[in-house]
């Protein structure tokens, strides 16, 4: 029975090495199956694809087969190690390959049935490019997880991951980047229930489960509440988390669709963890809170990682949730605080704090009306607010920051903003893309604005833009002179990075009830 919640204000053995090598060599010397045919409407081909619909479906099936075969080989070594970090890296890869298989299957399903329930926005070209981009980045994340390990495994699987990457990159070239196809009548997809549309704005919210440390709810920890939630739910399932500090690492797996979590306020309901790279966790697995199920919403909650700056990569929140919303949430840590890993995401009225690359990943994400706070780093360290991870020019991904306040946190203010030089971002990958617009930049931002990653890497291919920012850190006279950096002089240039255009917000944000500005109005 639902409850009513009032709105809150507040080293592998030699034998196994040989087996793995033989299996991988056998797989990668084999040929792929020929294209399979399927029945897809001519509309799909003319509006969304640059190749025949049959060829596109066949390419998807080939890529799915490649992913599954790599995963099958790697799974034989899942429990073969005593090395904690290596075991985590393999576990990550298996999960990430599983993500990729799902994303490719969604693409296949949606392209064959444009009105199916698995379609998210109803705008097929946007959905396909989003899911294919996610499938692309997963292989990179898998490889990155082997940093700090000494194992033959990384070298052996790199060929397989590279082959999957090439196949997905080819698929991305087959989808039109700017299709004229619209969602159903330009409105909210038909599968979204009307009663789900105002959950964030209602005075009362009907909840399905309550988490309370004092035993007054259905569960005393968040993880148990998540496990009890239905799989693949087509309606919103609401979990209310009462005030308190919940010291646990929460993972919302990919089958948990349309979960919503509501706390008693960002300073009242806190989910806290301390995993870090130094302690043997991969960056991906270090997250205090990780969500992969599509359609996730969080409101009035703090997600924190307390590992501290000396522990290096330590994620507070990681999202792979397509069409996810974080509203009035506090996301705090130091290095790598917020991992916007993949998919389409929206953050509104949030507080995000950290040091090095503290907003990073390869999602398509917009931040509106957020406080972005640079903290005091380690001695001789430089802060970079963003580190966007776009590796292919056909990806629609990037970071857009609009109507936000970018300032120093209290610890950096107390030490002097000059003690830790702070920059708007640096290019993690070759086609890194970040836009800052209509935001207040305090004197914490260095006059150069942006920071190199490693020499001249990506300076020609990145895309960094600024538009109508203000404040002592917004001066443009001393900004970097990189070929990939530009200042927008016209709104027509900046419009591409608004909620309406960049994340197709008008097609799905109304279903969440969250406040948002579609373009440039305050």
From Swiss-Prot:
Protein residues bound to substrate? 283, 313, 426, 428
Segment Pectinesterase PPE8B: which positions? 208-506
Q: Which residues form the signal peptide?
A: 1-30
Disulphide bonds annotated for this chain are: 350-370
**Keywords linked to the UniProt accession:** Aspartyl esterase, Cell wall, Cell wall biogenesis/degradation, Disulfide bond, Glycoprotein, Hydrolase, Secreted, Signal
E.C. number(s) listed in UniProt: 3.1.1.11
Pathway in which this enzyme or protein is active: Glycan metabolism; pectin degradation; 2-dehydro-3-deoxy-D-gluconate from pectin: step 1/5
Q: Which residues are glycosylated?
A: 105, 118-119, 218, 221, 274, 405, 489, 496
Query: Which CDD domains does this entry report, sorted A to Z?
Result: PMEI-like_4 (cd15799)
Q: Where is this site: Transition state stabilizer?
A: 335
Tell me which Gene Ontology terms the entry assigns under biological process: cell wall modification; pectin catabolic process
Q: A GO CC term?
A: extracellular region
**What reaction is this protein's catalytic activity?**
[(1->4)-alpha-D-galacturonosyl methyl ester](n) + n H2O = [(1->4)-alpha-D-galacturonosyl](n) + n methanol + n H(+)
Query: Which residues are named in the active-site annotation?
Result: 336, 357
Q: Where are the transmembrane segments?
A: none
Q: Where are the residues of the annotated region Pectinesterase inhibitor PPE8B?
A: 31-174
Q: What family name appears in the similarity comment? A: In the N-terminal section; belongs to the PMEI family. In the C-terminal section; belongs to the pectinesterase family.
Other notes: The PMEI region may act as an autoinhibitory domain and prevent untimely PME activity during transport.
| Its job | May have roles in the deposition of pectin in developing tissues and in the wall loosening and cell separation that occurs in cell expansion, fruit ripening and abscission.
**Protein's UniProt name:** Pectinesterase/pectinesterase inhibitor PPE8B
Which organism was this protein described from?
Prunus persica (Peach)
Q: What is the lineage of its organism?
A: Eukaryota, Viridiplantae, Streptophyta, Embryophyta, Tracheophyta
